[in-house]
Swiss-Prot record:
The gene is efg1. InterPro entries: Efg1, EFG1_rRNA-proc. It comes from the Eukaryota. It comes from Neurospora crassa (strain ATCC 24698 / 74-OR23-1A / CBS 708.71 / DSM 1257 / FGSC 987). The lineage of its organism: Eukaryota, Fungi, Dikarya, Ascomycota, Pezizomycotina. Residues 202-225, 240-254 have a biased composition (Basic and acidic residues). Residues 14-23 have a biased composition (Polar residues). Residues 255-269 have a biased composition (Acidic residues). Residues 1-53, 177-269 are annotated as: Disordered. One of its GO terms (biological process) is maturation of SSU-rRNA from tricistronic rRNA transcript (SSU-rRNA, 5.8S rRNA, LSU-rRNA). This is rRNA-processing protein efg1. The keyword Hydrolase does not apply. One of its GO terms (cellular component) is nucleolus. PANTHER family: RRNA-PROCESSING PROTEIN EFG1.
Amino acid sequence: MGKRSYEEAEGSNADGQEQNQAQKRNRNPHNRFNPKNIAKRQKTTQKINDGNLSQIKKRVRAIERLLEHKNEKLPANVRNDLERELQAHKQRIVDESDRKLRSKMISKYHMVRFFERKKAMRLAKQLMKQLDETKDEAEIARLKADLHIAEVDLDYALYHPHMETYISLYPKPKDEAAEKDEKSSAAHHLHSSRPPMWTTIEKARQEGKSALEKIRDRRPERDFSKPTSKKTAKKSSSQSEERPAKGKFGKTEEESANESDDGGFFEED
């Protein structure tokens, strides 16, 4: 068997090195060019685009960790793109949580608002009928004031913010006999105190229906300026600073001293 030439040996060595590098590249789980990683990234991106909330939250945490890493020197354009993506994902999370909260609150207070709307509407019709029949000026002024309250009550039941706790205008009396009495209806609570939102609705009525709808559909304000991971880090660090030092058996020195003074763990009442 003859010896191989120098060129043949060099060529075979080069082919072997390339093959080894390709195998290492495919075996490395952190290599971005690994076909498995490429498929995984594409699958994750598809889930994010489809609105998968858990995947969106994971992506938010990953971006925040990347932006907060001091040793990671990112180009300005890459950092700007990541910050814009972070804000967009946070807004999607807020929109989804608000949608769930709105649906929950509407379902929770649906019956209360429905019955109070019916009571206010019935009371307003009664007052309008009395207003048409009376001719006394003092009585007319009183009925107009009561009619205004009933109309605001109706708008309160219609346009109270869906994402806020609904405070009843006509709470049920504790006494069952009073509940059956006619005076326990909306007319009985006509001059009772009203929640602060009632005054807001009363002022918005002067601006028109669009102002009332804006109040009904308003959402709680949120601040996106600070990343969530920093908040949790600060919270954990502050808790660790405030936590007293623990002594033997995992108890604080103060607890151990109190137990020794009181005569042990088992106390008699």
